[in-house]
Structure formats: C-alpha cells, structure tokens
Amino acid sequence: MKDGRSSILLVAIAVVGIAAPFLLPTVVTQLAFLWLMILFAVTWDVNGGQMGYNSFGNVLFFGIGVYACALVQRDSGLGYYAALFVGTGAGALCAAIAAIVLGPPLLGIRGHYFAIATLGLSIAAADIASAWEYIGAASGIALPVYPGPITGRARFFYFLLFALAAVTWLTVRALYRTRLG
C-alpha cells in the first residue's frame, strides 16, 4: 500500500478506535477484547509469520506477565492506577526474562518439535499456576476494585488495550522496516 493511502487508513482506524466506545457503549467490553486479539495477532505474526515458528508458547509469556501484574496490584500497597502502571511494567519485565531464559533452548528446535515443546511448556505452566497457592491456585487472584464508576471501567480498559495494540503494531512495523525485519 502506498504511504498516502496507508496514512489515511491509519488515521481512519485511529478515529474509529477513539470514537467507538462513545458510539457503541453497549459493546465496549467486546471491543476491548477485539484490541486484545489484535495485539495477540500482531505479536504472533512476528513468531509464526515472519520467523516461521508455529508457537503455542505466546500464552505462557502472556500468563507470566498477567500474573506478575496482578501480584504487584495485590501486594504493592500502591493506588489502583499506580499499581496497574508498575504492575504492567513488572509483567513485561518478567515475561521478557522468561523469554530470555527459555528462548535460546527453544529456538534451537525446529518444525513440529518446536510447536510441541511450546505447547508442553504452556500446559505445564497452567498446571503449576493452578496448584500454586501464592498466586491464587485454581481460584485466581483477587484484584483491587476499580476506583471509578463501573461504566468507566470498560472504557478505561478499552483505551488501555487500544493504546497497547497501537504501540505494539507501530513497534513491529518499525522493526519490519529495519534490516532485521
């Protein structure tokens, strides 16, 4: 696509993305999940599309990040937004550390073996998480209550996921335009 048309399309997506929760207030939660799925699709494209690795391990790193974020929110004593911000950073850091530790041995495996290894790790992580009492085991983690009205919660998370999807897409797009991409 030419840069002019590409820019117009990006602006249109941004305008629709910003206006959507106000125009369609009854489906804001579903739209937030749409941005989450777009975020997953963009990140999976790096592994599965560009690198050719059919990975089932993305959920493992996502889970590590989410649990780390939830633990910071639960245990830090910070306010809601500060804990969410710090927790998101901690979650990203924990997921990155797990990727650095698990990446080299896994990336040495090719084809079906890689897919099976990442699937096995994801299943093992789910079993560990469901038995580990500190992180809530099978019951999960009770998080702090959103400090505003319940109607604002869905909109807040919509814009948070919209921003994360946009930043992730822009980062991957910039990466693809380098020599590495």
Where are the model-predicted features located?
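Transmembrane alpha-helices and adjacent helix-loop boundaries
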Residues: 1-181
